[in-house]
Amino acid sequence: MNKKIIIVTGGFGTIGLALSKSLLKQGHKVIVVDTRINKLGNNNANLFTIKANLNKENEIKKLITLCGTKFKKVDALVHCSYPKTKDWGVKLEKLKQKSLNENLNNQLGSTIIISKNIINLFLKQNHGNLILLSSIMGMNNPKFETYKGTKMSSPIEYSAIKSGIISITKYLAKYYAKKNLKINCVSPGGIEDNLPKRFVKNYKKQCNFKGLLDPKDVVDAINFLLSEKSNFISGQNIVIDDGYSL
């Protein structure tokens, strides 16, 4: 892959951190946008960190303007940011409208606004690559039996948000066809993250081989979409789930 300048939102999260590490290792310039503590240190000249509230369009515009001015171009943006309310994950019966509206705005609304603004920069450059992060829960109904015996659940708003991101991807790819842009999304299955043993066991029964994924499994697919090998792929949802969604 040619050396690129890449923005990673949510770059200190589970998938975002693994992606940022991978990109830095390959020699790319990586601009991590996150409100969390820097987990990558300050010893890499190719790493740049920015704190920004991605729910506010004025901050998004400032961020993208800053990157465009400082680096002269931005080759790609990978949107891994995943802000949640404190009561995220409650069962449907306990879901409150205020929380629902906030999560839809924070995750789905901000995805549209971020996409709109980075694409404006891409159009000025006459090239760009946008990768959004969805989920297999945006493709199919949850397999509720997987959660039996645990306190976990799959929130209805999560399915709505992630299916919306797949639709946004396809819409944008079609809307900006013939503009020399690549716009795709990635839908991972469950990621290993100190989850209950019962859930891990139930989940693996639904898969072909591995079960829960490592962040690296998702990063490999994102790296492919960032590379020249995917030059003629756009508007697609790439699924990485070890067969869970079958």
What are these regions (language model features)?
Residues 12-13:
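Conserved glycine-rich cofactor-binding loop
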Residues 20, 105-127, 134-138, 173-174, ...:
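Amphipathic alpha-helical dimer-interface segment in Rossmann-like NAD(P)H-dependent oxidoreductases
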Residues 75, 93-113, 127, 131, ...:
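Catalytic Tyr-X3-Lys loop
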Residues 83-84, 97, 131-178, 191:
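Catalytic loop of short-chain dehydrogenase/reductase
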Residues 87-104, 149-154, 202-204:
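Short alpha-helical oligomerization interface
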Residues 177, 182, 233-235:
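Short, small/polar-rich loop/turn modules that mediate ligand/substrate recognition or access, typified
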Residues 214-240, 245:
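C-terminal substrate-recognition "lid" of short-chain dehydrogenase/reductases
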